[in-house]
Protein backbone atom coordinates (compact mmCIF):
# COMPACT_ATOMS: atom_id res chain seq x y z
CA UNK A 1 0.00 0.00 0.00
CA UNK A 2 2.78 2.41 0.97
CA UNK A 3 4.68 1.49 -2.20
CA UNK A 4 1.69 2.27 -4.45
CA UNK A 5 1.01 5.53 -2.63
CA UNK A 6 4.58 6.75 -3.04
CA UNK A 7 4.53 5.88 -6.73
CA UNK A 8 1.27 7.79 -7.20
CA UNK A 9 2.59 10.83 -5.35
CA UNK A 10 5.82 10.80 -7.37
CA UNK A 11 3.89 10.78 -10.62
CA UNK A 12 1.27 13.32 -9.59
CA UNK A 13 3.06 15.79 -7.34
CA UNK A 14 6.78 15.75 -8.15
CA UNK A 15 8.21 18.38 -10.46
CA UNK A 16 10.77 17.30 -13.02
CA UNK A 17 14.10 16.40 -11.47
CA UNK A 18 17.63 15.35 -12.30
CA UNK A 19 19.17 12.27 -10.68
CA UNK A 20 22.89 12.42 -9.91
CA UNK A 21 25.02 9.29 -9.67
CA UNK A 22 28.74 8.75 -9.18
CA UNK A 23 30.38 5.33 -8.95
CA UNK A 24 27.53 2.88 -8.49
CA UNK A 25 26.70 -0.68 -9.61
CA UNK A 26 24.30 -0.73 -12.56
CA UNK A 27 21.85 -2.96 -10.73
CA UNK A 28 21.42 -0.27 -8.07
CA UNK A 29 20.67 2.37 -10.72
CA UNK A 30 18.14 0.02 -12.31
CA UNK A 31 16.48 -0.51 -8.94
CA UNK A 32 16.22 3.23 -8.33
CA UNK A 33 14.79 3.98 -11.77
CA UNK A 34 12.31 1.11 -11.58
CA UNK A 35 11.29 2.27 -8.09
CA UNK A 36 10.24 5.73 -9.26
CA UNK A 37 8.06 4.58 -12.11
CA UNK A 38 5.70 5.69 -13.61
CA UNK A 39 7.91 8.79 -13.68
CA UNK A 40 9.51 8.87 -17.13
CA UNK A 41 13.19 9.32 -17.93
CA UNK A 42 13.91 11.90 -20.65
CA UNK A 43 17.12 13.44 -22.01
CA UNK A 44 18.60 16.19 -19.87
CA UNK A 45 18.32 18.59 -22.81
CA UNK A 46 14.56 18.00 -23.01
CA UNK A 47 14.08 18.65 -19.30
CA UNK A 48 16.09 21.88 -19.56
CA UNK A 49 14.17 22.95 -22.65
CA UNK A 50 10.76 22.34 -21.07
CA UNK A 51 11.78 24.21 -17.94
CA UNK A 52 13.06 27.14 -19.97
CA UNK A 53 9.80 27.30 -21.91
CA UNK A 54 7.75 27.23 -18.68
CA UNK A 55 6.18 23.91 -19.67
CA UNK A 56 5.26 21.31 -17.08
CA UNK A 57 8.00 18.86 -16.15
CA UNK A 58 5.85 16.89 -13.72
CA UNK A 59 6.55 13.16 -13.83
CA UNK A 60 9.75 13.59 -15.87
CA UNK A 61 13.37 13.12 -14.83
CA UNK A 62 16.86 12.95 -16.31
CA UNK A 63 19.77 10.67 -15.40
CA UNK A 64 23.27 12.11 -14.95
CA UNK A 65 26.54 10.42 -13.95
CA UNK A 66 29.64 12.33 -12.86
CA UNK A 67 33.42 11.88 -13.10
CA UNK A 68 34.05 9.62 -16.11
CA UNK A 69 35.41 6.56 -14.28
CA UNK A 70 35.98 3.98 -17.02
CA UNK A 71 34.41 0.83 -15.57
CA UNK A 72 31.50 2.85 -14.22
CA UNK A 73 30.76 4.54 -17.55
CA UNK A 74 30.97 1.26 -19.48
CA UNK A 75 28.70 -0.66 -17.11
CA UNK A 76 26.11 2.08 -16.83
CA UNK A 77 26.11 2.81 -20.56
CA UNK A 78 25.34 -0.87 -21.21
CA UNK A 79 22.43 -0.64 -18.78
CA UNK A 80 21.05 2.56 -20.28
CA UNK A 81 21.24 1.23 -23.82
CA UNK A 82 19.67 -2.11 -22.85
CA UNK A 83 16.80 -0.39 -21.03
CA UNK A 84 16.37 2.43 -23.54
CA UNK A 85 17.10 5.13 -20.95
CA UNK A 86 18.72 8.38 -22.12
CA UNK A 87 21.57 9.46 -19.85
CA UNK A 88 24.23 12.14 -19.55
CA UNK A 89 27.82 11.51 -18.43
CA UNK A 90 29.75 14.54 -17.17
CA UNK A 91 33.50 14.34 -17.92
CA UNK A 92 36.38 16.20 -16.21
CA UNK A 93 38.56 16.44 -19.29
CA UNK A 94 42.02 16.50 -17.65
CA UNK A 95 41.26 13.18 -15.95
CA UNK A 96 40.36 11.66 -19.31
CA UNK A 97 43.42 13.21 -20.96
CA UNK A 98 46.02 12.20 -18.36
CA UNK A 99 44.50 9.37 -16.25
CA UNK A 100 46.33 10.98 -13.32
CA UNK A 101 43.29 10.80 -11.10
CA UNK A 102 41.60 13.41 -8.96
CA UNK A 103 42.53 14.27 -5.39
CA UNK A 104 39.43 12.79 -3.81
CA UNK A 105 40.08 9.51 -5.66
CA UNK A 106 43.61 9.31 -4.31
CA UNK A 107 42.41 10.22 -0.83
CA UNK A 108 39.76 7.51 -0.77
CA UNK A 109 42.49 4.87 -1.28
CA UNK A 110 45.10 6.52 0.93
CA UNK A 111 43.06 7.23 4.04
CA UNK A 112 42.97 3.71 5.56
CA UNK A 113 46.71 3.22 4.94
CA UNK A 114 48.09 6.41 6.46
CA UNK A 115 50.60 5.82 9.29
CA UNK A 116 49.32 7.03 12.65
CA UNK A 117 52.28 9.25 13.53
CA UNK A 118 53.76 12.66 12.92
CA UNK A 119 54.63 13.05 9.24
CA UNK A 120 57.01 15.61 7.77
CA UNK A 121 56.29 16.50 4.14
CA UNK A 122 57.65 19.13 1.80
CA UNK A 123 54.23 20.75 1.96
CA UNK A 124 54.16 20.79 5.76
CA UNK A 125 53.95 18.71 8.92
CA UNK A 126 50.92 16.51 9.64
CA UNK A 127 50.38 14.91 13.04
CA UNK A 128 48.30 11.75 12.69
CA UNK A 129 49.20 10.26 16.06
CA UNK A 130 45.91 11.08 17.77
CA UNK A 131 42.99 8.63 17.77
CA UNK A 132 40.82 10.84 15.56
CA UNK A 133 43.61 12.60 13.66
CA UNK A 134 42.99 10.87 10.32
CA UNK A 135 39.27 11.61 10.45
CA UNK A 136 40.00 15.24 11.30
CA UNK A 137 42.40 15.46 8.36
CA UNK A 138 39.71 13.95 6.12
CA UNK A 139 37.31 16.70 7.16
CA UNK A 140 39.92 19.35 6.41
CA UNK A 141 40.62 17.81 3.02
CA UNK A 142 36.94 17.92 2.11
CA UNK A 143 36.78 21.59 3.05
CA UNK A 144 39.80 22.23 0.82
CA UNK A 145 38.22 20.40 -2.12
CA UNK A 146 35.14 22.59 -1.87
CA UNK A 147 36.86 25.91 -1.34
CA UNK A 148 40.49 26.00 -2.50
CA UNK A 149 42.52 25.59 -5.66
CA UNK A 150 43.88 22.08 -6.16
CA UNK A 151 47.45 23.36 -5.79
CA UNK A 152 46.68 23.82 -2.08
CA UNK A 153 45.98 20.11 -1.51
CA UNK A 154 46.96 17.96 -4.51
CA UNK A 155 50.77 18.11 -3.96
CA UNK A 156 50.28 17.03 -0.35
CA UNK A 157 47.98 14.21 -1.48
CA UNK A 158 50.61 12.90 -3.89
CA UNK A 159 53.30 13.19 -1.19
CA UNK A 160 51.15 11.05 1.09
CA UNK A 161 50.78 8.53 -1.73
CA UNK A 162 54.56 8.34 -2.07
CA UNK A 163 54.86 7.90 1.70
CA UNK A 164 52.37 5.03 1.78
CA UNK A 165 54.15 3.26 -1.09
CA UNK A 166 57.52 3.73 0.58
CA UNK A 167 56.65 2.88 4.18
CA UNK A 168 53.65 0.56 4.00
CA UNK A 169 54.93 -1.74 1.26
CA UNK A 170 51.95 -1.03 -0.97
CA UNK A 171 52.28 -1.03 -4.75
CA UNK A 172 51.45 2.32 -6.31
CA UNK A 173 48.95 0.67 -8.64
CA UNK A 174 47.04 -0.56 -5.58
CA UNK A 175 46.35 2.98 -4.39
CA UNK A 176 46.09 4.70 -7.76
CA UNK A 177 42.68 6.01 -8.86
CA UNK A 178 40.65 3.94 -11.32
CA UNK A 179 41.31 4.49 -15.00
CA UNK A 180 39.01 6.95 -16.76
CA UNK A 181 36.96 6.20 -19.82
CA UNK A 182 39.06 6.79 -22.94
CA UNK A 183 38.27 9.32 -25.63
CA UNK A 184 37.88 6.62 -28.33
CA UNK A 185 35.32 4.90 -26.10
CA UNK A 186 33.56 8.22 -25.54
CA UNK A 187 33.35 8.71 -29.29
CA UNK A 188 31.99 5.20 -29.81
CA UNK A 189 29.41 5.35 -27.01
CA UNK A 190 28.35 8.83 -28.08
CA UNK A 191 27.21 7.49 -31.44
CA UNK A 192 24.23 6.00 -29.63
CA UNK A 193 21.44 8.57 -29.37
CA UNK A 194 20.73 7.53 -25.77
CA UNK A 195 24.20 8.46 -24.50
CA UNK A 196 25.49 12.00 -24.21
CA UNK A 197 28.77 13.28 -22.78
CA UNK A 198 28.97 16.78 -21.31
CA UNK A 199 31.44 18.87 -19.30
CA UNK A 200 32.53 18.48 -15.67
CA UNK A 201 35.20 21.15 -16.12
CA UNK A 202 38.85 20.50 -16.86
CA UNK A 203 40.56 19.87 -13.53
CA UNK A 204 37.63 19.14 -11.16
CA UNK A 205 38.61 22.19 -9.12
CA UNK A 206 36.11 24.19 -7.07
CA UNK A 207 35.19 27.01 -9.44
CA UNK A 208 34.97 29.49 -6.58
CA UNK A 209 38.75 29.08 -6.17
CA UNK A 210 39.58 29.99 -9.78
CA UNK A 211 40.60 33.35 -11.18
CA UNK A 212 38.28 34.92 -13.73
CA UNK A 213 40.65 33.85 -16.49
CA UNK A 214 40.94 30.27 -15.24
CA UNK A 215 37.19 30.01 -14.70
CA UNK A 216 36.50 30.94 -18.30
CA UNK A 217 39.23 28.56 -19.50
CA UNK A 218 37.77 25.62 -17.56
CA UNK A 219 34.36 26.18 -19.10
CA UNK A 220 35.43 26.94 -22.65
CA UNK A 221 38.20 24.36 -22.94
CA UNK A 222 36.23 21.47 -21.47
CA UNK A 223 33.29 22.32 -23.72
CA UNK A 224 35.49 22.36 -26.80
CA UNK A 225 37.32 19.14 -25.91
CA UNK A 226 34.11 17.19 -25.30
CA UNK A 227 32.62 18.53 -28.54
CA UNK A 228 35.75 17.54 -30.45
CA UNK A 229 35.72 13.96 -29.22
CA UNK A 230 31.99 13.29 -29.42
CA UNK A 231 31.04 15.19 -32.55
CA UNK A 232 28.06 16.60 -30.63
CA UNK A 233 27.83 20.16 -29.27
CA UNK A 234 28.65 20.14 -25.55
CA UNK A 235 25.82 22.22 -24.06
CA UNK A 236 25.67 21.18 -20.40
CA UNK A 237 28.01 21.49 -17.41
CA UNK A 238 28.13 19.93 -13.96
CA UNK A 239 29.99 22.06 -11.43
CA UNK A 240 32.78 20.14 -9.67
CA UNK A 241 31.60 19.25 -6.14
CA UNK A 242 28.43 21.25 -6.78
CA UNK A 243 28.05 23.03 -3.44
CA UNK A 244 27.28 26.74 -3.36
CA UNK A 245 30.62 27.21 -1.63
CA UNK A 246 32.48 25.42 -4.42
CA UNK A 247 30.52 27.14 -7.21
CA UNK A 248 30.92 30.69 -5.91
CA UNK A 249 29.23 33.87 -7.08
CA UNK A 250 30.62 34.22 -10.62
CA UNK A 251 30.36 30.76 -12.13
CA UNK A 252 26.66 30.77 -13.07
CA UNK A 253 27.03 34.00 -15.03
CA UNK A 254 30.02 32.62 -16.92
CA UNK A 255 28.32 29.26 -17.49
CA UNK A 256 25.39 31.05 -19.14
CA UNK A 257 27.78 32.22 -21.86
CA UNK A 258 28.92 28.70 -22.74
CA UNK A 259 26.14 26.25 -21.79
CA UNK A 260 22.39 25.69 -21.85
CA UNK A 261 22.50 24.43 -18.26
CA UNK A 262 24.83 23.89 -15.33
CA UNK A 263 23.92 21.43 -12.59
CA UNK A 264 24.65 21.68 -8.89
CA UNK A 265 24.20 19.26 -6.01
CA UNK A 266 21.56 21.42 -4.33
CA UNK A 267 18.31 19.53 -3.90
CA UNK A 268 15.09 20.42 -5.68
CA UNK A 269 13.17 20.16 -8.92
CA UNK A 270 13.84 22.00 -12.14
CA UNK A 271 10.51 23.78 -12.56
CA UNK A 272 11.57 27.32 -11.66
CA UNK A 273 15.27 26.83 -11.17
CA UNK A 274 17.95 29.00 -12.71
CA UNK A 275 19.17 26.83 -15.64
CA UNK A 276 22.78 27.57 -14.61
CA UNK A 277 22.15 26.59 -10.98
CA UNK A 278 20.07 23.52 -11.73
CA UNK A 279 19.37 21.27 -8.72
CA UNK A 280 19.87 17.52 -8.71
CA UNK A 281 18.93 14.59 -6.48
CA UNK A 282 22.03 12.55 -5.59
CA UNK A 283 21.53 8.85 -4.89
CA UNK A 284 24.19 6.46 -3.60
CA UNK A 285 24.61 2.66 -3.47
CA UNK A 286 23.78 2.51 0.23
CA UNK A 287 20.41 4.27 -0.21
CA UNK A 288 17.26 2.13 -0.19
CA UNK A 289 14.63 2.51 -2.89
CA UNK A 290 12.17 3.69 -0.22
CA UNK A 291 14.64 6.38 0.82
CA UNK A 292 15.09 7.40 -2.83
CA UNK A 293 11.35 7.79 -3.40
CA UNK A 294 10.89 9.74 -0.17
CA UNK A 295 13.86 11.99 -0.93
CA UNK A 296 12.56 12.83 -4.40
CA UNK A 297 9.03 13.46 -3.16
CA UNK A 298 10.22 15.57 -0.24
CA UNK A 299 12.68 17.68 -2.21
CA UNK A 300 10.70 17.91 -5.48
CA UNK A 301 7.15 18.32 -4.20
CA UNK A 302 4.90 20.75 -6.09
CA UNK A 303 1.96 20.42 -3.71
CA UNK A 304 2.59 23.66 -1.84
CA UNK A 305 3.68 25.40 -5.01
CA UNK A 306 0.36 24.63 -6.70
CA UNK A 307 -1.49 26.48 -3.94
CA UNK A 308 0.48 29.68 -4.28
CA UNK A 309 1.51 29.69 -7.94
CA UNK A 310 -0.51 27.66 -10.44
CA UNK A 311 1.69 28.70 -13.36
CA UNK A 312 5.23 27.79 -12.28
CA UNK A 313 6.49 24.82 -10.32
CA UNK A 314 8.63 25.76 -7.33
CA UNK A 315 10.75 23.58 -5.02
CA UNK A 316 9.12 23.52 -1.60
CA UNK A 317 11.38 21.29 0.40
CA UNK A 318 10.30 22.41 3.86
CA UNK A 319 6.59 22.30 3.06
CA UNK A 320 6.70 18.62 2.20
CA UNK A 321 6.68 17.89 5.90
CA UNK A 322 9.66 15.55 5.92
CA UNK A 323 13.34 15.74 6.68
CA UNK A 324 15.73 13.82 4.44
CA UNK A 325 19.26 13.53 5.87
CA UNK A 326 21.86 14.60 3.37
CA UNK A 327 24.22 11.92 2.10
CA UNK A 328 27.94 11.92 1.58
CA UNK A 329 29.02 10.36 -1.69
CA UNK A 330 32.11 8.49 -2.68
CA UNK A 331 33.55 11.49 -4.46
CA UNK A 332 33.58 13.75 -1.47
CA UNK A 333 30.53 15.55 -2.78
CA UNK A 334 27.96 15.87 -0.08
CA UNK A 335 24.50 16.89 0.96
CA UNK A 336 22.71 19.83 -0.54
CA UNK A 337 25.95 20.89 -2.15
CA UNK A 338 26.97 17.64 -3.78
Give the positions of each predicted feature:
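Beta-hairpin (beta-strand-turn-beta-strand) motif
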Residues: 65-68, 92-94
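Glycine-rich, phosphate-binding/catalytic loops in enzymes
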Residues: 79-82, 254-255
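Short acidic, Gly/Ser-rich segments with clustered Asp/Glu that frequently serve as metal-coordination loops
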Residues: 67-74, 79
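Metal-dependent polysaccharide deacetylase catalytic core of the NodB/CE4 family, i.e.
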Residues: 19-22, 59, 81-245, 272, ...
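C-terminal active-site subregion of NodB/CE4 polysaccharide deacetylases
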Residues: 1-64, 70-71, 192, 202-205, ...
Amino acid sequence: MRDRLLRFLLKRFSGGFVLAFHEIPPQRVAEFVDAIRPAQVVPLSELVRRSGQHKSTSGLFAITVDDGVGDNVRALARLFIARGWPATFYLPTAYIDTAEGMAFQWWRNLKPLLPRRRIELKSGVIDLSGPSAVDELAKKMEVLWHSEHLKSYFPMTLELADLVVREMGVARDAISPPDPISWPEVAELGRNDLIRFESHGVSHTAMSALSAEDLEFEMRHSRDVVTKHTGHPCRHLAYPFGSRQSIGTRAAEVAARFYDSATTMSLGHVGSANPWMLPRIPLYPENSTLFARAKILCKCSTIAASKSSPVRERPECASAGCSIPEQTGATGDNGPSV
